[in-house]
Amino acid sequence: MPVIEVRFKGNRREYFTPPPPAELADPLRLEDAVIVEVERGQDLGHVTALGDIALKKCARCQGGACGVGEDAAPKVEHRIVRLATEADLRTAGELRVAEEDVRRTTRDKVREHALPMKVSDTEWQWDRRKLTIYFTAEQRVDFRALVRDLAGVFRTRIELRQIGARDEAKRLDGIGRCGRQLCIASWLPEGRPVSLSLAKAQGLSLNPTQISGPCGRLLCCLHYEHDFYVQQRKRFPKEGKTLRTSEGLERVLAIDIFRERVTLRSEAGTTRVVSLDQLQA
C-alpha cells in the first residue's frame, strides 16, 4: 500500500494514502502542498517522503499515525484529498499569523485561571475546526475550565496537548551550541533518553550547563559518538587499575584514545606517558 509522509507546523509528521491517480494531473512530489483528511475535517501540509522511504518511516514510527512496530504492515487511516491551491496556501498563511494572537490570548487565560503551565505553541487546523494548544508543565494540570473558556472565545474544538522540553524544542526550532539548527527539529526522528554517563564515557565536562541544549536537557548529540568511545575504551586498561609493567607496579591515571596513550603513576609517585602499543608489548 503506498504511503506518503506529510509535514505540518512544528515538524509534526503524519502518514496518508495518496488519492487515486485519476484525481491528480501529475504525480505527487516532495514539498508539494496538499490537503489531507484528518480525524475531524481537513488540514494542509507538505509532502516530505514518498515511496519506500515513507513506507519504512511509517513502519518505524511508535505511537504516531501508524502505531505499529517496524516489522508490521503499516496501518494508515486517512488519505490525501488533493493538491493545495494558491487560495488554500493564503488561508494557511493567514492562520499562521492569527496563531500569534491565539497564543497571547491563551496565555492571558492561563494567568486568569492561575494554572502552572507554559503555553509553547498554537496550531489552527486548516479548516478551523480544531485549535491545538501545546504547553509544558512540571506536573499534571486540570485544564477543563480553561478549555471551556477557550472554546467560548475561539468558537471551535480545543485540544490542549502537554509536551516535554525536547518536543517543545522540536516544534519551536532554534540554534544549538554548535551554531547549527537543532537536530531534533531538522533531521533527528525522535529524541532518545540522555544521561550523564554518556558524557562521562567521552571524557566531557559533567557540568550540566556545558552539555545541555536550549531545551535545558542534556544534548541529544551525546549519543552520536558514544558507541565509538565504548568500543575504543575496551582496548585500554581502566582508569584507576594497577598494572605490572617493566617499571614495576603502576596505576592508570588517564587514557587518551585519540593519541593512543596511557598516563601511569608508579608507587614512588613518578608519572609517565606511554603508548598503548608500548604498554601491551
Segments from the language model and where they lie:
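Conserved glycine-centered short motifs in functionally critical loops
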Residues: G174-T245, E250-L253
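Basic/aromatic-rich interaction segments and small domains that mediate binding to polyanionic partners
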Residues: D256-V273
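General beta-strand recognition
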Residues: T132, R251, R261-T263
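Acidic-enriched and Gly/Ser
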Residues: M1-S205, Q210
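A short macromolecule-binding patch
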Residues: E14-F16, G269-Q280
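Hydrophobic/basic alpha-helical segments enriched in Actinobacteria
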Residues: E39-R40, E112, D167-A169, L222, ...
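Glycine-centered tight beta-turn/hairpin loop motif at sheet-sheet or coil-to-beta transitions
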Residues: N11, T245-G248, E267-G269
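A short, compositionally biased
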Residues: M1-P2, L28-L30, F236-E239, D256-E260
